[in-house]
Amino acid sequence: MAPFASLASGILLLLSLIASSKACSCAPTHPQTAFCNSDLVIRAKFMGSPEIIETTLYQRYEIKMTKMLKGFDAVGNATGFRFAYTPAMESLCGYVHKSQNRSEEFLIAGRLRNGNLHITACSFLVPWHNLSPAQQKAFVKTYSAGCGVCTVFPCSAIPCKLESDSHCLWTDQILMGSEKGYQSDHFACLPRNPDLCTWQYLGVSMTRSLPLAKAEA
């Protein structure tokens, strides 16, 4: 195994030199988009520091899954995941877990590869308690209703154009200056009828929709 370890170390060093000036860039993502585009969505706790896998360009974090929110069909009879895999270097969008609190629970939206959970710096991965009550509710049972049917369409500059009635115009970046705005925190893009999707409020005590955004001619 030593030759493979030496080769992997050499490759890591070479890539770090090549990519040292390149930072990982991630596009803003609405939580619903993160849910729908992920193979797996779980709640889990990180149990320690990452372990470098010498024969690959990856490292892995030991995790303790507390609840699976998406991915039941994909994992089959698997009862959980012990590790989350990520690129070993930040320049390759490797995820770096900074919290030292092993009792803190995180929402992890990742990909399934060869039966393993994979995450990157661009993955939707946040402390569960940092999510709004509406987001927590949506990750458990609401976002799934829009997957494959509706699309959150980012608006990063005015004017914005909708390409389909199944799109919901996401304007948080324009109106709030951040992707963590009102639509992200409190709304989901859901079907109103077979040919139309609209923003729908995720509050517990009331249900209302944002005004429909009209596409430019």
Curated annotation (Swiss-Prot):
GO cellular component: basement membrane; extracellular matrix; extracellular space
Pfam families linked: TIMP
Signal sequence bounds: 1-23
Residues reported in the UniProt entry to bind Zn(2+): C24
Site-annotated residues for Involved in metalloproteinase-binding: N37
GO BP annotations listed: cartilage development; cellular response to peptide; cellular response to UV-A; connective tissue replacement involved in inflammatory response wound healing; negative regulation of apoptotic process; negative regulation of catalytic activity; negative regulation of endopeptidase activity; negative regulation of membrane protein ectodomain proteolysis
Region feature Involved in metalloproteinase-binding, mapped onto this chain: 24-27, 90-91
SS bond partners: C24-C93, C26-C122, C36-C147, C150-C197, C155-C160, C168-C189
Gene3D superfamilies linked: 2.40.50.120, Tissue inhibitor of metalloproteinase-1. Chain B, domain 1 (3.90.370.10)
Inducing stimuli: By follicle-stimulating hormone (FSH).
Function according to Swiss-Prot or TrEMBL: Metalloproteinase inhibitor that functions by forming one to one complexes with target metalloproteinases, such as collagenases, and irreversibly inactivates them by binding to their catalytic zinc cofactor. Acts on MMP1, MMP2, MMP3, MMP7, MMP8, MMP9, MMP10, MMP11, MMP12, MMP13 and MMP16. Does not act on MMP14. Also functions as a growth factor that regulates cell differentiation, migration and cell death and activates cellular signaling cascades via CD63 and ITGB1. Plays a role in integrin signaling.
Protein name (Swiss-Prot/TrEMBL): Metalloproteinase inhibitor 1
Keywords recorded for this protein, A-Z: Disulfide bond, Glycoprotein, Growth factor, Metal-binding, Metalloenzyme inhibitor, Metalloprotease inhibitor, Phosphoprotein, Protease inhibitor, Secreted, Signal, Steroidogenesis, Zinc
PTM: The activity of TIMP1 is dependent on the presence of disulfide bonds.
Assembly information from the UniProt record: Interacts with MMP1, MMP3, MMP10 and MMP13, but has only very low affinity for MMP14. Interacts with CD63; identified in a complex with CD63 and ITGB1.
Record has Signal as a keyword: yes
